[in-house]
Amino acid sequence: MEPIQKMDSLNNKEGQPDKKRKKHESEKEGENEVLEIDVTKPVPPSKKLMRKLRKAGKIDKDGNWTPEALEEAKKKEEKRLKRLDAKYGRKEEGESQEESKRSPWGIWVGNLSFHTTKEILTDFFVRETSEMIKEVSEENIKPITTEQITRIHMPMSKEKRFQNKGFAYVDFATEDALKLALQCSEKALNGRNILIKSNTDFSGRPSKPANTLSKTASIQSSKKEPSSILFVGNLDFETTDADLKEHFGQVGQIRRVRLMTFEDTGKCKGFGFVDFPDIDTCMKAMELGHNSWRLEYGEDRSKRMRNKSPMARSGRFNDAESLGQEDKPNFKRARKIDPRSVRPGAALAKAQRSSAAIVEPAGQKIKFD
């Protein structure tokens, strides 16, 4: 038996390897290696996306973009940049900086046709000023040229495409060109007599109402009586409790800040309440004020009363007006009940019930005739 066991052990060593074999040196080295990822590089596309792109013919078998796909992506990027230029009014590369600059000699042009363009307006000033000088026959004065018009700003309508809003701003390079342009007012352009005013002429504007009330007078003109609660309105949606505490903390201690917020976003609804420990501190906060916030005294809950009837407010017998008022009958009409809707047995449900127990004998004999 011993030689057979020795042969088995030799077969395990030389022939077939044991189950618990040693790992290869390359596997040990692979375990010690660390995978490095470059965060700056773009994320590689997934296998699903690569299959879609390969079926669409945008990439080849090696995963490289085809020339047709690159040309299509370039056109899309150009369209996107054009939309941004149209939306935010970005200047094109070929446009000179002199055309985009404002000058001190500018005019406002109103009552324009909605289909008037910048080119039509430029031709109008060149044509009208040249005809004006021919009529006067003065050699010293020169008409307006396209080079003297440095800027034309014509706001476009958002609702209707390719239509202006009916007015424009034009800047000139010289003061003489400005004077000639002002003389073109009330002249026809596209069937309308346009109006031209200098950018420094503010006549015709309604005068702003002068606020002659001081802070004290404005506080006294408040409809509500002073209280320890201050209502703050016209707040920005990004306003927080810390902003109110920082502003009103200058006058003294703040008991509580109640900022009304939306349930879904948690942002401010535009108003809130600030509670102070006393009325004097609240009045100081009212005098402090704010440039954009609307401040008003709040209503104290402890002093809040429900609206009562005039008889309950004034007293029934002491007020002459309450005596003249007739008392209205306070009764309710009986509810009509359909006898067909009454449940069986409900009619006798409230009837007096007699006891079914044995009656105790009282010593009297009952006779039946």
Swiss-Prot record:
Does the record's keyword annotation contain Acyltransferase? no
Write one Pfam family the protein is assigned to.
RRM_1
Chief localisation class: nucleus
RRM domain segment(s): 105-206, 228-310
Biased-composition ranges, Low complexity, are 346-357
Q: Where are the transmembrane segments?
A: none
Which keywords has UniProt assigned to this entry? Nucleus, Repeat, RNA-binding
Q: Which GO terms describe its cellular component?
A: cytoplasmic stress granule; cytosol; nucleolus; nucleus; ribonucleoprotein complex
- List compositional bias (Polar residues) regions by residue number: 209-219
Can you cite a GO biological process for this protein? rRNA processing
Q: Which SUPFAM superfamilies match?
A: RNA-binding domain, RBD
User: Gene3D superfamilies, per this entry?
Assistant: 3.30.70.330
Return the PANTHER family for the record: EUKARYOTIC TRANSLATION INITIATION FACTOR 4B/4H, EUKARYOTIC TRANSLATION INITIATION FACTOR 4H
Q: What protein is this chain from?
A: RNA-binding protein rnp24
Q: Which organism is it from?
A: Schizosaccharomyces pombe (strain 972 / ATCC 24843)
